[in-house]
Each structure stands twice: as C-alpha cells, then as structure tokens.
Amino acid sequence: MMEQKTVRVGDIDVANDKPFVLFGGMNVLESRDLAMKICEHYVEVTNKLGIPFVFKASFDKANRSSVHSYRGPGMEEGLKIFQELKDTFGVKIITDIHEIYQAQPVADVVDVIQLPAFLARQTDLVEAMAKTGAVINVKKPQYMSPGQVGNIVEKFAECDNENVILCERGALHGYDNLVVDMLGFDVMKKASKGSPIIFDVTHALQCRDPLGAASGGRREQTVDLARSGIATGIAGLFMEAHPAPDQARCDGPSAFPLDKLEPFLNQIKQLDDLIKGFEAIEIN
C-alpha cells in the first residue's frame, strides 16, 4: 500500500489517510466586514464539529471572464484583511497569487499560497512560490489529465519545496462543461506519490454560458458532488460560501448558502469518518 504524505499547515495535518480538512471561505474579498462575518461563521461551525479549518479568500481575481467584473481589493488591502482575520479568529489562511512579485509578500502573511489552475504550468511562477518555503495548493487545470499532476509536484520538489497539496476542480468535457472523474483522485495520489488531494466542489459546479461574461453554476448539486469526492478517501474539501449567493460579486451561482454550512459539514464529517474507518482493500 502506498504511503500517504502529510503536509503540515501550522498545527493542522493534511493527508489522504487523516481526518479531512476544510479549506473554506468566500470567493473574493468583497469587504472587510463581510469577510469577518463569513470567517466567524466558519470558525463557529468547524469548532463545534471538530473539523480542522483553513479560511480561503482571494484578494484579486485576475482571471475574470470580463474586464468589467469585480476583481477584489488588491494585494495590499487584502493582506491587511487577512492579518486581521488571523489576529481575531486565530485561523490559517489560504489565498491565490498570479504574479511572481506577489509570492513572498503573500507568503509572509498567509499559511498556504495557491497556484491557479490556468497558471499551473508556469515554471517561473512555480519557482517563485517554491522559494518562499510556504505550503502550496496546486489547482489542477481543467485541461490536464490526473496523471499529469506529477510533473507539477516534481517542479516544486526540484525547487526544494515538497509541501504541496493538489486540488481537483473538474475537467472540461466539450465546451463549457466541467465533469469530475471520481477515478481521478486515486490517479492523482499515485502520480504524486501520495500527496494530499483536496476537492474544490464549488468550482467543479461552474457551468458557463458560451456567450456570457460570467460563469453560471449548479450549487444545488453541491451536496451530492461533495459526498462523492469525500467517499474516495481524500485529504480535504475546498468550498466557497456566501450569506446571499445570488448577490455575490464572483461565482454566485456556484456559491454555497452560508446558513446551510453546519448540516452540510456534519454529513461530510460523518461520511469521512466512516470511509477512513474501513480497512483498506488492496487489489493488484
């Protein structure tokens, strides 16, 4: 049986054979007050349920479909908000970067820096992120097969950073349709020699209008998809929630309703406990 790697985010163990970690929050920082409200709710729920938690938000959505779409407050203001969240709630933070110059300043504040799916093969960006020594979350590109993630992990290892988490977010099947291949989780584990795999259930539910300027979504299918992913035995779940999804400034159609967070996570935790309590069956 292949040994599963453990990546440490502060005092949190992230591994495929350990209790799942929630990487949850909001899509983009809309305001300081909303970030505080959403983070507080996540902290209350995860503390109650005993779920390890890392808060997620973006300071700049640099890859929006339309030039007119809201991008966020920017790095300087975003890092101030992240620091306040850490000071207030004691949470770990994950956020994404898009430019080489952002790597070190962001790593100085947050606990995990994320390599966006569209940039996952950009070697110069990979090198800059690796050199910070931070934990890295790699979003698997929609165009990449599960087995190819091993090459990205190798790039980070060549730069002396093996603190890598891999994130599945669906693959393109035809135009504008994302599908999650549940067999892909095991392929990713093997290709990366046991790296922790997490599942971005929110973005996997995006459904684009081929002529539109923003992504649609299928948030009503979040529970089914999340259960399916967790049932494969993975390290964590990645999700975004909002108190009023239809008013969210980015990816509202796939955002999870914040008031449904506790019953949802309660089910996911029970399922994760059940799956990881089974004796492994090895088939050659």
Swiss-Prot record:
Keywords: Cytoplasm, Lipopolysaccharide biosynthesis, Transferase. It comes from the Bacteria. Its EC number is 2.5.1.55. The keyword Cytoplasm applies. One of its GO terms (cellular component) is cytoplasm. Belongs to the KdsA family. This is 2-dehydro-3-deoxyphosphooctonate aldolase. The gene is kdsA.
